[in-house]
Amino acid sequence: MAERRICLSKEAKDGLEFLKRKKLQKMRSDSVNETVGFSTMARSGGDALRPTSASCGMRLRVTSSDTVSKVHGASTVRGGLMKEKVEKLETDDLKWTERLPECPVYRPTKEEFEDPLTYLQKIFPEASKYGICKIVSPLTATVPAGAVLMKEKSNFKFTTRVQPLRLAEWDSDDKVTFFMSGRTYTFRDYEKMANKVFARRYCSGGSLPDSFLEKEFWKEIACGKTETVEYACDVDGSAFSSAPGDPLGSSKWNLNKVSRLPKSTLRLLETSIPGVTEPMLYIGMLFSMFAWHVEDHYLYSINYQHCGASKTWYGIPGSAALKFEKVVKECVYNDDILSTNGEDGAFDVLLGKTTIFPPKTLLDHNVPVYKAVQKPGEFVVTFPRAYHAGFSHGFNCGEAVNFAMGDWFPFGAIASCRYAHLNRVPLLPHEELICKEAMLLNSSSKSENLDLTPTELSGQRSIKTAFVHLIRFLHLARWSLMKSGLCTGLVSNTYGTIVCSLCKRDCYLAFINCECYSHPVCLRHDVKKLDLPCGTTHTLYLRDNIEDMEAAAMKFEKEDGVSDLITTDEDLYKYPSSITLPAAKEDGYTPYSTIYFDFYTEVEMTSHDQLQSGNPVMSYEANASCISSVADDYECSDYVNRRANCSSSSDSKLSEEVACSSSKKTRFFPVVQDEQLVADQESDGSDSECFRVKRRSSLKFENRTVVLDTRESDHHQELKRLKKSHHHEGRYSSSSSVSRQEEEEDELVISNRKETQQQSDVKMQKKRIENHFGGFKRLKVKGLIKP
């Protein structure tokens, strides 16, 4: 149907021609068993469009043409095993669309609508069982979205992404990918184009029944003639009006405000993340779609429909997420497309947000699926770990953002474990969020908790339980590290959140670093097995207020409900631990006991210019800080005795004696050195309607001033320098010691030359390291543990 084809970019046109040539070559080459592949929109502008693309959609394989009518599915041999795949989509029988139950619909009053997170906590026990729910707003926007985008936002334009409308095969034979971008539009130009496409297809400018368009969509996906559609996803911005007279824009349901509300955990992030803490726009047309996916870190999402045609949603309850992934793994993907075995294999591919297949496949395997038809003025909320997908019935404009509450932490812990298993860099500092929320709860008064609802109390217990598990594990890991005798130094951790160089888990409370500062490692790894190129010096970085946190954890353990959860819940914060941790009271270990690290150390303080980062795209978004100042040159090589005592007692303090007059504190955010990993991570997104969200390349980091905390050296160090000065004066005042003085001066010159050469070597080594600190004095601790 040439009259419905969209004017595509040259890149997209070349891509489609490439697909046609490949399809023709495959048809000619398959002389015995011809494989018919149907291309699908399973990606948004990130992957190649091939008839059998490994990056697009559902697995659908049928045999030669003379047996197509007899075969409803197919099997494929992988390693001698036969695996049943997704059956051929029967377009003559789409009655399954009528069997899908509706998700719950809520119509709050204006009073109930006052606070979105309070209302969501109220409906959570029921709505979360469906994975998604719909909320009809009692408030109406007086300023239309079109007016906001055309008038309030000057020069608002966006570039679409080209989506193919076909089903595809999922195997390793077709991994050619390329980015297919569409045209750049104004809001009105895109609306005209989308409405023109709809009118040409149905000879109507009005809306059609939702059930009819749902069947039309799956027919088009299976065997339609429309090759592509254009979808504007991940568009920075918001269509909520800033006019004070707009009721909806002035309310807390304005998505610009949701993630920063008092009950949202994401308010604790120091830097905004587009699509997560800041909303994004999704401007669609007939049959533009968002593939099956789950939110980053299993976050909540809230989506508002500003204007236009309806949108159909399919949702899976979070409790059925593993069952969903199992069906996808066994019935959609081939084994050779999976990056890993087990349940995480399908999860890894689904993270690309490039897979679309009919819900009938899930119904046939007893996976619960619920449907929602969203209209303008309605919100759709997806709950933690709820997979969802959907498509548009015509031109429309939606907006979405993420948020999290206390009940999210158990889901976030699972997501962090799975990311570590797949060696994926996290988007959020999960450990830091736990600690901050827990310490806020610890400081709150009992009177503040008197009027809490059961759901709110449950959320608080989730936070406290997660916090206790984390603190208990880190205490045990530190005790094991102390017993090993392999820790050569202890430093106050003031760097915020860093990422483990081995498993990519985020570290906020404690981590181990090497001599060159470029290999931070979390405490889940065995120090004995570390093979670092810079040697075997391992310094433990520990947060200053660890004692306060341990005291808070001990307090939480005594509360009703929390102690029960601690004994029954799985401790997810140990994963992927490679160290053998003793059980309680084994080898003398007691939870929350005092841990002593005794060192005899040589402390050197040096300064280095800030190095140029090779690729800062994966610096931790939650605490991105830039330091451009360079510390003054300054050296010191006095020997000091240093004893760091880490305990849970209130009078114990993390202390260190450093032979320097001052030190500066800042944050450290290591850069991921694996370029391929960074490329893979670029596809991550948080919104329910994005394909290939290059969030990290479009992050708008807020410039924040980092206060450099200068600590004065203690009086003991001044006395040492005075004593040393007087000692030298006494030695060199005698005239009979002139020759000896000259010899010592020569030795000092030689020593200075050696020291200068060593510093030069260190500087050259550090210039080759992308993952670094820059612009502040560094503490190098060398020495042996005292027997």
UniProtKB/Swiss-Prot annotation:
Keywords: Flowering, Iron, Metal-binding, Nucleus, Oxidoreductase, Repressor, Transcription, Transcription regulation, Zinc, Zinc-finger. Induction: Accumulates in response to higher temperature and during long days (at protein level). It catalyses: N(6),N(6),N(6)-trimethyl-L-lysyl(27)-[histone H3] + 2-oxoglutarate + O2 = N(6),N(6)-dimethyl-L-lysyl(27)-[histone H3] + formaldehyde + succinate + CO2. SUPFAM superfamilies: Clavaminate synthase-like. Changing residue 296 to A: Impaired demethylase activity. Residues 103-144 form the JmjN domain. Zn(2+) 1 binds at residues 500, 503, 522, 525. The record marks 179, 236, 282, 296, 402 as: Histone H3 binding. Changing residue 295 to A: Impaired demethylase activity. Gene3D superfamilies: Cupin. This is Lysine-specific demethylase JMJ13.
